[in-house]
Regions:
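Surface-exposed interaction regions that form or flank ligand-binding interfaces
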Residues: 1-3, 12-13, 20-107
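Short beta-strand scaffold segments in enzyme catalytic cores
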Residues: 7-9
Length: 107
């Protein structure tokens, strides 16, 4: 992935690339946006279809957006990635996680 500071979370509500605002929100947003694109790219190549990978910068302050990247207060992160429509079945979540693990092993 872009720098190794990003984390990928996959579950029934989707796939998310997360990072902290290091060294600042704007730089982190660009970095996690690239990471989300990379993950989606190799998922599409491996699975012929892939979910959108939401890029998020997790902050202690207020949320918002930097270009296409969400800026999410840490206190709301759990709710954001667990609430909402279940868009991925368990089998697909397992396949996505396996592909991410395999790709991470090659990096």
């Amino acid at each position: 992935m872009a720098s190794g500071q990003e984390r990928i979370v996959v579950g029934p509500t989707g796939a998310f690339a997360l990072t902290t605002p290091d060294p600042d929100v704007e730089t982190a947003a660009r970095r996690v946006g690239r990471a989300a694109g990379e993950v989606r790219g190799y998922l599409v190549a491996a699975l012929s279809w892939a979910p959108f990978v939401d890029a998020l910068v997790v902050v202690e302050g207020d949320g918002g957006r930097v270009e296409t990247v969400g800026v999410v207060p840490s206190r709301l992160l759990t709710r954001m990635i667990t609430d909402g429509p279940q868009v991925l079945g368990h089998e697909l979540v397992d396949r996505i996680v396996a592909e991410i693990d395999q790709h991470a092993g090659r990096a």
